């Protein structure tokens, strides 16, 4: 079907988002056209503001509008434990369960040789710098239970073995091949309780 160029451009923009195909993009584009102009301008401003005002925490790599982020700035958190996750959305999922009171480290990906992504391409070097702090007693590896997540967890555990820091892996109450962001709070809580040393 042929659409006017502004609709086609809008649809193309929506299709750049994950999980949005042509039908969903058309539905969203026509929804936007039906919105009040003020609402469309607010929506556009929110997108631009988020892109301009958010960055990554210089300590843990979590997305934030302040540096360091609210988690790293919270003096009540247990600074002897660092939970390593793949993405910022995993931090948000872990925080929803309200059981973990330590700190986080966001890798921004996983090791994936098939995609040409090695350890130096994700946030592992910064993790190693953080672990030079003598107060760190445990690193919890909470990468996703898929091939890349397991490979990344195994790589980090082998890297840390000589350090004497306790390295644990969250239990697999999570489905193999699943993502942390889609797990409910109870499943995540049980996975944290059942973590094991690696």
Swiss-Prot record:
Q: Which Gene3D superfamilies match?
A: 3.30.60.80, 3.40.1360.10, 6.10.250.240, RecR Domain 1
Checking SUPFAM superfamilies in the record gives: Recombination protein RecR
Signal as a keyword of this entry, yes or no, is: no
Positions of the Toprim domain: 80-175
Which InterPro entries does this one have?
DNA_Rcmb_RecR, Rcmb_RecR, Rcmb_RecR_Znf, TOPRIM_dom, TOPRIM_RecR
Q: Which UniProt keywords apply?
A: DNA damage, DNA recombination, DNA repair, Metal-binding, Zinc, Zinc-finger
Recorded GO MF terms: DNA binding; zinc ion binding
Does the keyword Zinc-finger belong to this entry?
yes
* Residue ranges covered by zinc fingers (C4-type): 57-72
Stretches of the chain forming a coiled coil according to its record: none
Q: Name one GO biological process term.
A: DNA repair
Return the similarity comment.
Belongs to the RecR family.
Q: What NCBIfam families does this protein's entry cite?
A: recR
Q: What is this protein called?
A: Recombination protein RecR
Instruction: Specify the species.
Output: Listeria welshimeri serovar 6b (strain ATCC 35897 / DSM 20650 / CCUG 15529 / CIP 8149 / NCTC 11857 / SLCC 5334 / V8)
